[in-house]
């Protein structure tokens, strides 16, 4: 099935263009007027490249090279979208070797509690919403403890799967990363 999607447009100052990807940065300013955060949209140059393969293959060095070479203005048409994501972290942390805190016999959480306790669950949840009014993003992690007791000639149209990021504008370090597949 096909559906009509509104693609609000905007002029942005930071165009990203490399042999592998094209994109933009939408700046979000702090109270003093300096860029504090940026929303990044990236499209693989190869229209047939799977967006998940593209996102997986983009390493830190390549990303920082893109970030450091951003230049010029671009006109952007980006769909409005929103996502919620929730994950139980116990198994994820176990893969990373973090297991003792979940074992009542091994947990040593004396730095945060006066009694013997262990963590029974850890949940991470994120939310992002992008629309014509801007970007809203939030993330929270909860643990359950148990005690023994501008204008341009360039135009980018995001009308196919793409990758997005929220980045610290001063460093370019990604704070949120995701992909949009249903356009």
Where do the PLM segments sit?
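Mature hydrolase/peptidase catalytic cores and their serpin-fold inhibitory cores, especially
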Residues: 1-183
């Amino acid at each position: 099935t096909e559906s009509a999607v509104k693609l609000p447009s905007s002029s942005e100052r930071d165009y990203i263009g490399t042999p592998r990807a094209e994109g933009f940065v939408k700046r979000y300013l702090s109270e003093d007027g300096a860029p504090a955060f940026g929303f990044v949209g990236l499209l693989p140059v190869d229209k047939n490249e799977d967006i998940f393969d593209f996102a997986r293959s983009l390493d830190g060095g390549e990303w920082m090279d893109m970030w450091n070479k951003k230049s010029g203005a671009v006109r952007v048409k980006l769909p409005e979208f929103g996502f919620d994501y929730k994950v139980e972290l116990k198994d994820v942390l176990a893969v990373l070797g973090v297991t003792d805190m979940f074992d009542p016999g091994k947990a040593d959480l004396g730095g945060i509690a006066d009694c013997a306790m262990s963590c029974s669950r850890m949940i991470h949840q994120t939310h992002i919403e992008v629309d014509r009014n801007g970007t809203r993003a939030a993330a929270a992690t909860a643990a359950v403890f148990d005690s023994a007791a501008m204008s341009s000639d360039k135009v980018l149209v995001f009308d196919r799967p793409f990758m997005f990021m929220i980045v610290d504008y001063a460093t370019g370090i990604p704070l949120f990363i995701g992909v949009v597949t249903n356009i």
